[in-house]
Amino acid sequence: METLLLDGETLTLEQVRAVATGAARAALAPAARERVRRSRALVDARLEDGEAHYGINTGFGTLAEVRIPRADLERLQRNLVLSHAAGVGAPLPLAEARALVLLRANVLAKGVSGIRERTLELLLAMLERGVVPVVPERGSVGASGDLAPLAHLALVLIGDGEAFLAPPGAAAPPERLPGGEALRRAGLEPVVLQPKEGLALVNGTQAMAAVGTLALLRAERLAALADLAGAMTLEGLLGSHRPFAPEIQAARGQPGQIEAAAHLRALLAGSELNASHQGPGCHKVQDPYSLRCMPQVHGAARDGIGFCRGVLAREVNAATDNPLVFPDTGEIVSGGNFHGQPVALALDVLAVAASHLAAISERRVEQLVNPSLSGLPPFLAPQHGLNSGFMIAQVTSAALVSENKVLCHPASVDSIPSSAGREDHVSMGMTAALKARQVVENVRTCLAIELLVAAQALDLRAPLRPAQRVADAHARLRERVPHLSEDRALYRDIEAVSRLVDEGALEL
């Protein structure tokens, strides 16, 4: 198993997914270890200068004017974690929670947070031994960072809160335990937080970045899968390949469109179905937009998803706590890197971009099940009337598309003041992340429905064969889901194709 060396500078989004899913380990890079030590030494030195340093020997937020006696500084950090652990709702899934731990460790490895090496090593040991904090999804407004989610992470470090014990690769299901017990069972000991450490742990954008990164990576795969689903539908509807010609795309010059069209051309190469309706007997002039404009719509989605990638690729290596500790200059400086606006905006774009993959997919499903548009039996049903076929599968897709329209209302245009007005503009970045995650989940299901319905259409076009890559995907789908010869409970089929999507089994 690969071991990633965290330095706060070079972590990639794919590496985040690898650690989150247990496919890679993480350790502290030697150069980062030295930076962490120097940063901590500066914090310790400043404790002796008699000056007020925010969050080190003062209260927090609107309580920043309160000086804390030296004897109470450890208690101050513990109280910060305890008081801020006020999240509610379902816990983050294990992969997202592991991504959260990784991102916080990576940011601390930059050496500008004042954390002790021992505390950072405990975070990494938790990842290694499968101690995954129970982190409620809700309670963050995205500035000062994701305070509540990160406080729930920090609780486990001090032997409080709750954690799942889920060693990577273990066959047993995760066990939910008190945080201290989870550490003990994993052979780890909690830490007593020193000045600045509580603040270094809870102040940052890592929760929204963790959820957003995994949603983004899933959306990227779905953007490619949307081309496959669309190609399968096009074949089932005897649609034209001509709108995907490279000269059409070059005349506009949008990169995502060019990429999507090239993928569609590759998927559709060598199609018998396409050749069958190119002669003088074919009276179709133009296909509906949901077929003809796939490069434009899928391409725009790719471009929006790509914008989000750029933001998150920077954010996973970003120092976002406050204050920041700069040992080279000897300064400890308060700023606003904890504000999640860049991430919130990007995740709103991700949700909107991905939603269009589902919206156009649902319209293609309508083309398939509508006999006046497809020339196939109504709802692709055998003995229609007695059987309803895929009638309600299309309705399910429509329901998810409409749900996405609600979810795509941008979180980042909202703000609500908190902390007695000191935190008077916030990003709602975690809300944007959770919405984007659900939108992407809905897109996956809509594409699974399209693949299921399009496969039925291809069956009905036999003996003509589709393009080889479409035929290969059709064959893999049929290994799990048989042809619909009479009505059955379609939720099982939708779930089976959704699992194929999740496994990447249809990626060609």
From Swiss-Prot:
User: Into which EC class is this enzyme placed?
Assistant: lyase
Cross-linked residues for 5-imidazolinone (Ala-Gly) are A143-G145
Quote the CDD domains the UniProt record gives: PAL-HAL (cd00332)
Q: Does the keyword Glycoprotein apply?
A: no
Modification sites for 2,3-didehydroalanine (Ser): S144
**EC number(s) per entry:** 4.3.1.3
Q: Which SUPFAM superfamilies match?
A: L-aspartase-like
Could you name the Gene Ontology cellular component terms for this entry?
cytoplasm
- Superkingdom, taxonomy of origin: Bacteria
Q: How is it modified after translation?
A: Contains an active site 4-methylidene-imidazol-5-one (MIO), which is formed autocatalytically by cyclization and dehydration of residues Ala-Ser-Gly.
Molecular function in Gene Ontology: histidine ammonia-lyase activity
The alphabetized UniProt keywords are:
Cytoplasm, Histidine metabolism, Lyase
Q: Which GO terms describe its biological process?
A: L-histidine catabolic process to glutamate and formamide; L-histidine catabolic process to glutamate and formate
Q: Which family does it belong to?
A: Belongs to the PAL/histidase family.
| The name this protein goes by in its record | Histidine ammonia-lyase
Q: Say which species the protein is native to.
A: Anaeromyxobacter dehalogenans (strain 2CP-C)
